[in-house]
Amino acid sequence: MTRIKPPALPENATIAVVAPATAPQTRSDLEQAVDYFESRGHEVRLGKNLRKVHGYLAGTDAERAEDLQWALSEPGIDMVHAYTGGYGTARLYKLIDWDAVGDPRIVCGYSDLTALHLALAKHANWVTFYGPNILRFTRRKDDYPLTSETEDWFHRAFKPQPLGRVFEDPENPYVLTVGSGAGEGPLVGGCLTLLASSIGTPYEFDAEGCVLMVEDLNTDPYLVDTAINHLILAGKLDGVKGFVFGTDVNLKDQTIPEEPQSNLSIEEMLDELIGPLGIPAIANVPVGHGKHMATMPLGAQVRVDGDAKTLEVLEAGVA
């Protein structure tokens, strides 16, 4: 089924900022991000519970759900932008009135926000955007600065023109061929941990006829192996048109615990698990956690070419 595209982002957009997962880290971070978008002529509206904290969450489930319901349903909102990822978005599934979701609007976020992308694909059939959370739009100099590549791709993603070929990571430009050939289809995917945990729930993803994109952060290689093998055994790579693995970000020591001489690189693991599937597949593409991030329209048509080592967005994600 063809996804519904939200309208392109207007010059003077109304942007709702919510935190379905982890709480804002500091007030200054939030203020810097708001200033960034206001300086570009946009109106930024904050969820009323945005600054609340409940353990590692941005408020209770009810408080986070209230903000998310408002952002998805309130008339006049052009874009819903997640503050950050973390944990807890999937806890809101049963608290949102999906029938009350309003007109299509841009929804952007990544990492734990994979859960929201899956829910909106199921209940609203929208094209949504796996892209930087609003926390990235600060002057922070940590692992996730706002690079020119990330910034340019982000703003182009919400215009009614195809994005074209995804840029190479300027600091690690090598893209690995895992499977040869080329394939096209709607883009499906997100954070590997969230995709794997969706299996067996009403929100599990369907990648048949699609290009599957996965990425993750701070994960032991053997756990990446486990998660990808789980997808394969669950049939989630049956009938896919292509496979994309993001950049390896902050991978932990590539050894099995208590067996320091045992190791298997991510490249070797992908060759062993994905290679035999005979599908076009590439790895080390900047589509998630990492210093440079390409905003990707989930549900839009893309093309992956294993021999050319490219991922190309063939159509605009907005109308």
Over which residues does each language-model region extend?
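N-terminal glycine-rich "phosphate-gripper" loop used for MgATP/nucleotide binding
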Residues: 79-89, 110
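Internal helical hairpin/lid segments
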Residues: 203-265
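ATP/NTP phosphate-donor binding region
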Residues: 1-76
